[in-house]
């Protein structure tokens, strides 16, 4: 059920003077690298007076900072979780017309909270996309099977890299926050799905479980590895990804992951702690990875010449 509208969202507050000088964690990258970014942007909630973080949680307080952050980062692919339709439209506006979003709401009518992929179409062409419900009937909107009280989804896009000729698959998801059984079964479903894909794969999202959890172990026992664990450079000193509107915290749980197939080279990866104007754009922090896969063009070899037999 969609919560009542936060009427304060109609008049967004300014993030403050000088905030246009945001220093990104990664920022735009050139070929053959791709900048992948996953971010739980925290759904717009009705305001409950007197609750902790009530002011920090206001969408009207967070939106200007969130816009500045994603405008500075401009990833090749941005996976978002928890966005309501109006929030998705505002983020798409911040990214501009070079980006195309694919995704759907999790509910039976395909409305409500969504996971989405925002793709930079100057670099990547969307070949196809689909929504999957994390259930025994993945093609049935709103379906639930694993013990979660609300539907959970994933979105898969097949992309052509216009710079390298490679074709890759990107999946974004949001696992259940209450049921460990649901998370485990969802991980099995996604691992089975991605193991069957042909070509490079990235899986990103909010998994509501830490590194080393059953869900993480299940997803990384196939073709996928955790980008932060294999990166040449780590972008954070050991931060968790759920800071709950506070500063980034060393030793916190990393609930948000960015997984890639073992054939990828990960230049750098980690949690971003940018606070435009001192404002935390969400209760989660984004996770980034700079990744490159072998070029399809480089892999092509001329046919070996064999002299005809006499």
Question: Which residues fall in each region the model found?
Answer:
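Solvent-exposed loop/turn segments at secondary-structure junctions
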Residues: 41-43, 84-86, 107-109, 124, ...
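Metal-dependent phosphoester/phosphodiester hydrolase catalytic core
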Residues: 46-47, 162-184
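Soluble or luminal CAZymes and related metallo-dependent hydrolases
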Residues: 58-66, 83, 148-152, 181-189, ...
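Active-site beta-strand/loop signature of hydrolases that rely on acidic residues for catalysis
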Residues: 35-41, 66-91, 118, 157, ...
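N-terminal, active-site-proximal structural segment of metallo-dependent hydrolase catalytic domains
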Residues: 1-94, 107-112, 295-310
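Metal-dependent phosphoester-hydrolase catalytic domains
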Residues: 3-6, 10-26, 123, 181, ...
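Surface-exposed cleft-lining segments at the edges of enzyme active sites
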Residues: 51-55, 138-146, 172-181
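Structured beta-strand-rich core segments of catalytic domains in phosphoester-bond hydrolases
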Residues: 15-28, 33, 77-167, 270-272
């Amino acid at each position: 059920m969609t919560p009542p509208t936060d009427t304060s969202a109609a008049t967004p507050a300014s993030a403050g003077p000088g905030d246009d000088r945001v220093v990104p964690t990664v920022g735009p990258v050139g070929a053959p690298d791709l900048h992948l970014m996953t971010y739980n942007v925290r759904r717009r909630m009705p305001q409950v007076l007197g609750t902790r973080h009530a002011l920090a949680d206001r969408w009207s307080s967070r939106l200007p900072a969130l816009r500045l952050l994603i405008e500075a980062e401009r990833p090749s692919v941005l996976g978002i979780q928890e966005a309501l339709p109006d929030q998705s439209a505002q983020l798409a506006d911040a990214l501009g017309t070079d980006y195309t979003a694919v995704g759907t709401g999790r509910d039976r009518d395909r409305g409500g909270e969504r996971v989405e992929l925002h793709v930079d179409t100057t670099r990547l062409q969307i070949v196809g996309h689909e929504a999957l419900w994390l259930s025994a009937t993945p093609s049935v909107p709103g379906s639930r099977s694993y013990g979660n009280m609300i539907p959970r989804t994933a979105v898969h896009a097949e992309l052509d890299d216009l710079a390298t000729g490679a074709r890759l698959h990107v999946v974004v998801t949001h696992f259940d926050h209450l049921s460990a059984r649901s998370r485990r079964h969802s991980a099995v479903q996604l691992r089975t799905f991605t193991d069957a894909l042909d070509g490079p794969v990235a899986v990103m999202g909010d998994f509501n479980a830490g590194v080393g959890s059953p869900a993480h172990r299940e997803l990384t026992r196939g073709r996928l590895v955790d980008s932060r664990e294999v990166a040449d450079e780590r972008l954070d000193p050991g931060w968790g990804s759920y800071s709950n509107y506070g500063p980034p915290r060393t030793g916190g749980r990393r609930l948000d992951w960015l997984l890639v197939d073992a054939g990828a080279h990960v230049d750098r990866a980690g949690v971003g702690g940018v606070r435009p104007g001192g404002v935390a754009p969400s209760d989660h922090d984004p996770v980034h990875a700079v990744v490159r896969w072998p070029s399809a063009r480089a892999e092509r070899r001329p046919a070996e010449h064999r002299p005809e037999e006499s």
